[in-house]
Design a protein with these regions (language model features):
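Structural motif
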Residues: 4-6, 109, 137-140, 169, ...
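Substrate-binding N-lobe of the ribokinase-like
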Residues: 3, 24, 28-95, 305
Length: 306
């Protein structure tokens, strides 16, 4: 299948080492670096998940003209991902998150980023999406709040996708869910749900009410709230469903939402019901949170759970 992936492209950097003493200059640990690892992050982690699940992925987003964007392009090529639909903006800085780690614990995260929104970039991205929409099977929006997923861009994307009866899946960010109106499915986590729903989220009924509120308020057909160790709550426009999580060891939740939305959209578009696709996505998420760092699922790993 062919998938359009729209979102904020991020380079993840992991600097690992040992801490054996405190700095004499300030009461902070000294990290003796032993390893550095650069991986595709943000929406590009969704691209990796989609590719590993057998999709051809059209990754659409913005990077700066800098060394970090060169690294992203090289990593994409190594992963078998197409790079030709990415806009290189001389006025932007490629988003990069550097995590400093000792004994599998994060000490600090350093972010380098600049909002990538401009009308010119918006027009370029819209043109790319329109040129690809007829050859795609589904669209996935991975919003990390860095500026790519603007209201106008998503309005045009959802409009032309709906005209072609192509499902749009949303992994949201922030409190402006209006820009996701008329999408097919949205997959907020608890924090993202609280950004738009100001009532308690404790019981299953609370989560059911939140799902229906999101669908009714923003004219979205289906909603899946990911609840961490408590699994998922699903509203499929008619019924509510709850899926339990059997996760045992959680080392890192980074990228779990990426894996959920990639697996869900892939299997649902293949023909699985939304509930069955969500169950498979839940299993995929349980696997990736047992690993450290931004790690995508692959088909062989997923098959071992099915």
């Amino acid at each position: 299948m062919n998938a359009i992936l729209i979102g904020d492209l991020i380079l993840d950097n992991y600097i690992s080492g040992d801490v054996e003493r405190i700095s004499p200059e300030a009461p902070i640990p000294i990290l003796n670096q032993t390893k550095e690892k650069l991986v595709l992050g943000g929406a590009l982690n969704v691209s990796r998940n989609l590719k590993n699940l057998g999709n051809k992925v059209f990754s659409i987003g913005i990077v700066g003209k800098d060394n970090d964007s060169n690294t992203i392009f090289n990593l994409m090529k190594e992963s078998g991902l197409d790079t030709k639909h990415i806009v290189v903006d001389h006025n932007s800085i490629t988003s990069k998150k550097t995590r400093f780690i000792a004994n599998n614990q994060q000490l600090l995260r350093l972010d380098v980023e600049k909002n990538t929104y401009s009308e010119e970039n918006e027009k370029k991205l819209t043109k790319k999406i329109k040129s690809l929409i007829k050859e795609t099977d589904f669209v996935l929006v991975s919003d990390y709040g860095k500026g790519v997923c603007s209201k106008n861009l998503l309005y045009e994307t959802i409009k032309i996708a709906n005209e072609g009866k192509i499902k749009v899946f949303i992994d949201p960010k922030g409190s402006d869910f209006n820009k996701y109106k008329k999408a097919y499915c949205i997959t907020p986590n608890i924090l993202e749900t609280k950004a738009v729903y100001n009532k308690p989220l404790v019981t299953n009924k609370n989560f059911e009410n939140a799902c229906k509120f999101i669908c009714d308020t923003f004219d979205i057909e289906t909603c899946i709230i990911t609840r961490g160790k408590d699994g998922m709550t699903i509203y499929d426009s008619e019924n509510y469903h709850h899926i339990k999580s059997n996760v045992k060891d959680v080392f890192d939740v980074s990228g779990a939402g990426d894996t959920v939305v990639a697996t869900l959209s892939t299997y649902h578009t293949k023909g699985k019901t939304l509930i069955d696709a969500a169950k498979i996505a839940n299993l995929a998420a349980q696997h990736v949170v047992s690993k450290f760092g931004t790690t995508p699922i692959n088909q062989e790993e997923l098959n071992s759970y099915l």
